[in-house]
Amino acid sequence: MENDRQAIVVWMNHLKQVRSLKRFGNVHYVSRKLKYAVLYCDMAEVEDISEKVSRFHYVKRVEMSFRPFLKTEYESKKEMMYEHKNEDVQISI
């Protein structure tokens, strides 16, 4: 039973309040130089959490990750070339 998770990137003015983000999900990474934190939460709650987090005075902006919507399984080039050759042979017959 695996939950679908999505990352939320929270850009902040100060990193002092990073600990307060723990109640919204799992804080995966914090960049001290660029002042942002990556927060993982359930996909069903992403909209609500991003609205709540963006209301804090120390938050500059909130961005959602598009990784769950990207294709991560790729076909090899050889398989694609083999399929194209087979199609060409069938068309010529």
From Swiss-Prot:
Cross-referenced InterPro entries: DUF2129 (IPR016979)
Family of this protein: Belongs to the UPF0298 family.
Keyword terms, alphabetized: Cytoplasm
Organism lineage string: Bacteria, Bacillati, Bacillota, Bacilli, Bacillales
Main localization of the protein described in the UniProt heading: cytoplasm
This protein's name: UPF0298 protein lwe2074
Subcellular location: Cytoplasm
Native source species: Listeria welshimeri serovar 6b (strain ATCC 35897 / DSM 20650 / CCUG 15529 / CIP 8149 / NCTC 11857 / SLCC 5334 / V8)
One GO cellular component, as annotated: cytoplasm
Keyword Cytoplasm: yes
Keyword Cytoplasm set for record: yes
